[in-house]
């Protein structure tokens, strides 16, 4: 699991920009990042799984069972690799089609977001200004109290705390007022954005493109299933030695335990 977490962390920390820096490629799209994340995660799970199998076989229970899981793990890993290679082109086609068919929706939503952002920006700027003014006023009121603390030290600490409490409460109340005012001004735009999103989704639902894409997706899933059958059969065949070895060993242990009980 540490390997998986490390792989996920590296992917998120580096992202597409690290790949672009080293390989000088064009920056990745969000779809590419999703696919890369899936690949890295699967590889990390495979590597960490082999590590856990190795740890289990070297344990006392693993030595007693003697399942020889590690011998079959590499074969299983190569089978999974072949499965990924066979299904890769079909999956790539699915992502490409989905990205193309929803391009207009992303474009319209970005346009709506930019429009709303332009309308609410003055309110955000006003809120930031008010915030800075309140902080500056608080600091101004704090300066004489700080000097008083330095001069009076410990004996005036309690008195200083009593003076600071109403100042902090006053700042909190004033900022709460500004936040409420900003929320009131932003509510219509939030409702407007929600309505526009619902409208865009309704357009997507009623568009003939979606119905056509639904048919394409069904065909894609059917083709995916046909291509997956041989690879999944190989995967099943690769797992059979593991299951048979496990079953044989367990039956042997049960039989041995039964003989010991009967002998008693």
Curated annotation (Swiss-Prot):
Keywords: Cholesterol metabolism, Glycoprotein, HDL, Lipid metabolism, Lipid transport, Lipoprotein, Oxidation, Palmitate, Phosphoprotein, Repeat, Secreted, Signal, Steroid metabolism, Sterol metabolism, Transport. One of its GO terms (molecular function) is chemorepellent activity. One of its GO terms (biological process) is protein stabilization. Sequence repeats lie at residues 67-88, 89-110, 111-121, 122-143, 144-165, 166-187, 188-207, 208-229, 230-240, 241-264. Residues 67-264 are annotated as: 10 X approximate tandem repeats. Major protein of plasma HDL, also found in chylomicrons. It is found in: Secreted. One of its GO terms (cellular component) is chylomicron. It comes from the Eukaryota. InterPro entries: ApoA_E (IPR000074), Apolipoprotein_A1/A4/E (IPR050163). Residues 1-18 form the signal peptide. The modification Methionine sulfoxide is found at residues 109, 193, 240. Glycosylated. Belongs to the apolipoprotein A1/A4/E family. PANTHER family: APOLIPOPROTEIN, APOLIPOPROTEIN A-I. Homodimer. Interacts with APOA1BP and CLU. Component of a sperm activating protein complex (SPAP), consisting of APOA1, an immunoglobulin heavy chain, an immunoglobulin light chain and albumin. Interacts with NDRG1. Interacts with SCGB3A2. Interacts with NAXE and YJEFN3. This is Apolipoprotein A-I.
């Amino acid at each position: 699991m540490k390997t998986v977490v490390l792989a996920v962390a590296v992917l998120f920390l580096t992202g597409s920009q690290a790949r672009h820096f080293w390989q000088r490629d064009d920056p990745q799209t969000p779809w590419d990042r999703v696919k890369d994340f899936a690949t890295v995660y699967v590889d990390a799970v495979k590597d960490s799984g082999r590590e856990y199998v190795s740890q289990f076989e070297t344990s006392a229970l693993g030595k007693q069972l003697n399942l020889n899981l590690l011998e079959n793990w590499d074969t299983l890993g190569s089978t999974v690799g072949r499965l990924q290679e066979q299904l890769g082109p079909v999956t790539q086609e699915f992502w490409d089609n989905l990205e193309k068919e929803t391009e207009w929706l992303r474009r319209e939503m970005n346009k709506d977001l930019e429009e709303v952002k332009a309308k609410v920006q003055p309110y955000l700027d006003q809120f930031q200004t008010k915030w800075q003014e309140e902080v500056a006023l608080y600091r101004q009121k704090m300066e004489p109290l700080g000097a008083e603390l330095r001069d009076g030290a410990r004996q005036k600490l309690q008195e200083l705390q009593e003076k600071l409490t109403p100042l902090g409460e006053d700042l909190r109340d004033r900022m709460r007022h500004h936040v409420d005012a900003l929320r009131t001004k932003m509510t219509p735009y939030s409702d407007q954005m929600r309505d526009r999103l619902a409208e865009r989704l309704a357009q997507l639902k009623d568009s003939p493109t979606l119905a056509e894409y639904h048919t394409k997706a069904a065909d894609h899933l059917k083709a995916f299933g046909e291509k997956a059958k041989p690879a999944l059969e190989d995967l099943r065949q690769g797992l059979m030695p593991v299951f048979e070895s496990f079953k044989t060993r367990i039956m042997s242990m049960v039989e041995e335990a039964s003989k010991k009980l009967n002998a008693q």
